[in-house]
C-alpha cells in the first residue's frame, strides 16, 4: 500500500509543479465564488462575518469516486450556522492519482482474494485515502495563506481578520490548516 503511494508521489509532485498556476487559479476562483455568496447573504442579514472556512472531503464523494471537496464558510455559530454557504472543488491533480490507485488495488485484491466483499474493498480504500488527505493538508497549509490573502482583500468586510481554515471529513473533526489552533 505505502510503496504504491510513495511510487506515485514524485510524478504527482512533478505534475503539480507543472500545473501549479492553473490549480491555484481554479481554487482562487472557487473561493471568490463562495465568498461572494457569503457577502450577498450578509447584505440581507442572513449570515454574520466569516470566522471559519471548512474544507471537507465527503463520504458520498468517496463512494462515487468523484473526490470533490466541499468548501463551507461559517460565521461565529460554526456548525450551528443555519445559513449554508458552500461550493465544491475537485483537486484533479490528486484525484487522478487516487483513482488510478483505487483501480489498481481493486484489481489486485479481487485477484488475490476472490471472495472479498465490496464493503471490505471500500474499507480498504477509506484507509488508503488518508495518504492523499494528508497530502492535501500539506497543500492547503502551503497554498491557502497566500490565496486567502488575495481573496480576503476583495471581501474584507465579509471576513473576520483572524479567520481559521480547517480540513477534514464533512461535519467531523478537522485539522487547522490556517489560523490559530485552539488549546
What residue ranges belong to the model's regions?
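Aromatic- and glycine-enriched beta-alpha-beta binding-site module
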Residues: 44-102
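Short secondary-structure junctions and interdomain/linker hinges
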Residues: 34-45, 62, 105, 112, ...
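Low-complexity, serine/threonine/proline-enriched polar segments
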Residues: 84-131
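Short N-terminal edge-element motif at the start of the domain
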Residues: 3-50
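Conserved aromatic-histidine-acidic binding/catalytic patches
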Residues: 15, 19-26, 124, 128-136
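Short, Lys/Arg-enriched charge-dense amphipathic segments
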Residues: 34-46, 65-80, 108-112, 127-128, ...
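Generic hydrophobic secondary-structure signal
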Residues: 27, 31, 53-57, 71-73, ...
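Acidic, proline/glycine-rich low-complexity IDRs
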Residues: 1-4, 126-183
Amino acid at each position: 500500500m505505502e510503496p504504491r503511494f510513495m511510487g506515485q508521489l514524485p510524478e504527482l509532485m512533478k505534475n503539480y509543479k507543472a500545473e501549479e498556476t492553473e490549480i491555484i487559479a481554479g481554487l482562487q476562483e472557487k473561493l471568490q465564488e463562495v465568498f461572494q455568496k457569503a457577502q450577498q447573504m450578509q447584505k440581507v442579514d442572513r449570515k454574520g462575518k466569516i470566522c471559519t472556512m471548512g474544507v471537507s472531503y465527503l463520504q458520498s464523494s468517496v463512494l462515487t469516486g468523484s473526490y470533490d471537496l466541499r468548501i463551507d464558510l461559517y460565521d461565529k455559530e460554526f456548525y450551528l450556522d443555519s445559513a449554508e454557504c458552500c461550493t465544491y472543488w475537485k483537486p484533479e491533480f490528486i484525484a487522478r492519482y487516487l483513482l488510478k490507485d483505487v483501480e489498481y488495488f481493486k484489481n489486485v485484491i479481487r485477484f488475490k482474494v476472490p471472495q472479498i466483499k465490496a464493503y471490505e474493498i471500500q474499507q480498504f480504500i477509506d484507509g488508503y485515502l488518508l495518504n492523499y488527505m494528508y497530502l492535501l493538508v500539506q497543500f492547503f497549509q502551503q497554498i491557502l495563506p497566500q490565496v486567502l490573502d488575495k481573496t480576503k482583500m476583495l471581501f474584507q468586510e465579509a471576513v473576520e481578520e483572524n479567520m481559521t481554515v480547517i480540513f477534514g471529513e464533512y461535519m467531523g473533526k478537522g485539522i487547522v490548516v490556517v489560523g490559530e489552533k485552539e488549546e
